[in-house]
Regions:
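ATP-dependent adenylation/nucleotidyltransferase module used to activate substrates
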Residues: 1-155, 166, 175-176, 182
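AMP-forming adenylation/ATP pyrophosphatase catalytic core
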Residues: 124-132, 136-354
Length: 354
């Protein structure tokens, strides 16, 4: 065992994780990251992730468990490494996953640095995933509760990070976590799970980007696959691949967003059939299962958080980019999202879809 810093959000998962670690003999320290103020993101009274109420919830659990507790202000880092990247990606016609950047830069970098300063040997979170050691490497594995598995948003973890990370909930089902919290008398046992992107709780990404960048939307043309103008769009940030709602284009067939081009400021619309493709290119890959991957191999790939993995063949190019050829065409492969590769319940690695 040793000393561990637990990332506590005020929710049931991180609270039970803290309890389990203390029960198993770890010297526990709790910490909550404050990432923004509601006023800074244009929200007046909405309860969001990392709100003051959540800080008090986490503090109450830490007090009940009799463990030290800290609050760390990472708002500058969050703005620079998560919010700015989110806004920039949408401006480039991509659809990012900010939870992955939050894990990469905040939880497993800045929070871990604080853990080291506090003399901790490891950090822990309430993620549903598992870490196992095999043949001298640390492997990231799916949680036993497939419906709550979060390995997709953890693909960026390095060997060094995996060696100093604990996921106490990886072998539990969510129902068991809530039952345990109930039995312990935790007041947050029935607290709802966080939903959507924490700093855009209303789901209006375009409005957030306007506030964050200070730039107004730039209207442009909707075009079909041949380039014929179909109408006017409100700004590229309003649209993502596969979207049908909110287009406002009269048509005798359903139309969907197929692509967006920030250079021409055009959004391409098509029928549903044109959204399917069998191949993608990924970049910035992090490999977990190997130091260096085979040049070609078969596995399964996931291209969005709640999707079931799909069988595919992978080719690793000389420069490090990755070609993924699916056995069957996939709908709405979206640039900016993560592609994560699996062998059964083991994460092989992952990267960003081009």
């Amino acid at each position: 065992m040793g000393k561990v810093l637990i990332a506590m959000s005020g929710g049931v998962d991180s609270s039970v994780a803290a309890y389990l670690l203390k029960l198993s003999g770890w010297d526990c320290v709790g910490a909550t990251m404050t990432l923004y103020r509601n006023e800074d993101i244009g929200i007046s009274r909405s309860r969001t992730c990392c709100s003051l109420e959540d800080v008090e919830d986490a503090r109450s659990v830490a007090f009940r468990l009799r463990i030290p507790y800290y609050v760390f202000n990472f708002s500058d880092e969050f703005r620079r490494q998560v919010m700015d990247r989110f806004a920039d990606a949408y401006g480039q016609g991509r659809t990012p996953n900010p939870c992955i950047d939050c894990n990469r830069y905040l939880k497993f970098r800045h929070l871990y640095d604080r853990a080291v300063l506090l003399g901790c040997d490891a950090i822990a979170t309430g993620h549903y995933a598992r870490i196992e050691q095999e043949n001298g490497r640390y492997l990231l594995k799916k949680a036993l509760d497939a419906s709550k598995d979060q390995s997709y948003v953890l693909y960026m973890l390095t060997q060094e990070q995996l060696a100093h990370t604990q996921f106490p909930l990886g072998a539990l089902h969510k129902a068991e976590t809530r039952q345990l919290a109930d039995s312990l008398g935790f007041f947050n046992a029935r607290k709802p799970d966080s939903q959507d992107i924490c700093f855009v709780p209303d789901g209006d990404y375009a409005a957030f980007i306007r506030r964050h960048t200070g730039k107004a939307d730039t209207p442009g043309d909707f075009v079909d696959e041949s380039g014929r103008i179909l109408g006017c769009h409100r700004g590229i940030a309003h649209y993502t691949i596969g979207q049908r709602k909110g287009l406002g284009i009269p048509s005798n067939r359903p139309l969907y967003v197929k692509a967006s081009d920030p250079k021409s400021n055009q959004v391409v619309l098509s029928g549903n059939d044109a959204l399917f493709s069998q191949q993608l290119t990924g970049e910035n890959f992090n490999w977990i299962a190997w130091e260096a991957p085979p040049r070609q191999f078969r596995c399964s790939a996931k291209i969005r958080y709640r999707q079931t993995e799909q069988p595919c063949e992978v080719t690793v190019e000389e420069g490090g980019s990755v070609q993924v050829l699916f056995d069957r065409p996939q709908r709405a492969i979206t640039p900016g999202q993560a592609v994560v590769l699996y062998d059964g319940d083991t994460v092989l690695g992952g990267g960003t879809i081009l």
